[in-house]
């Protein structure tokens, strides 16, 4: 599903990625580890089509609408409620039976009781859970998760563990994390940045 050959990205004089190569088959799970500033986020942004490489080749065999992405900062509208956020994205993604899917995801991620609350009033962990719901809303083939456990409380982390285990092998994942032990058993490929 993803092939990278000598992939590079520079920001001015700073080299964010240098000659990264890997292949990830459909339904594979790539675990990306490394220190802060090592290029994990840059790699995910390139795979999501949010940035362009400055060298090398990258082939992502998924259309934009088949990709779910969760970055460092949860992409949600803080002035909208949890329900309004997901309903809006369901319309944007043209999700069939969007109402049912929205309700199911809010329930699975422990946000059903908070569905009428403004996202701006949520804790960082709740915002992360809402962003994960948004990323899963359109049932994407490829999920790109940048530090998905960041700011999750114990309940949120357990929910994410369950979701990843349920979807592993049926979806393609690229997960960048400082906590590789949580998802190590799911990985079919690994990429470690220095």
Walk through the language-model features, giving the residues of each.
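The feature captures the beta-strand-to-loop junction immediately N-terminal to the Walker
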Residues: 33-35
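Helix-to-loop junction immediately C-terminal to a conserved catalytic motif
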Residues: 48
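Hydrophobic anchor residue at the start of the ABC signature
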Residues: 132
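Conserved ABC ATPase "signature" region
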Residues: 87, 97-114
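Catalytic Walker B motif of ABC-type/P-loop ATPase nucleotide-binding domains
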Residues: 143-147
């Amino acid at each position: 599903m993803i092939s990278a050959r000598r992939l590079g990205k520079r920001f001015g004089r700073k080299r964010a990625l240098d000659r990264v190569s890997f292949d990830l088959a459909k339904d594979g799970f790539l675990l990306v580890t490394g220190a802060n500033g090592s290029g994990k986020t840059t790699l995910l942004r390139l795979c999501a089509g949010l940035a362009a490489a400055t060298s090398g080749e990258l082939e992502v065999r998924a259309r934009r609408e088949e990709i779910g992405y969760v970055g460092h900062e949860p992409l949600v509208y803080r002035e909208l409620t949890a329900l309004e956020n997901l309903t809006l994205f369901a319309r944007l993604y043209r999700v069939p039976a969007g109402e049912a899917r929205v309700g199911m995801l809010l329930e699975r991620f422990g946000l059903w009781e908070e569905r009428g609350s403004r996202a701006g009033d949520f804790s960082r962990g709740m915002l992360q859970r809402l962003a994960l719901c948004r990323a899963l809303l359109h049932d994407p083939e490829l999920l790109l998760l940048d530090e998905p456990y960041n700011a999750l409380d114990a309940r949120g982390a357990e929910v994410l563990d369950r979701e990843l285990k349920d979807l592993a092998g049926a979806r393609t994942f690229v997960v960048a994390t400082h906590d590789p032990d949580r998802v190590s058993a799911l990985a079919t490929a690994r990429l470690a940045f220095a």
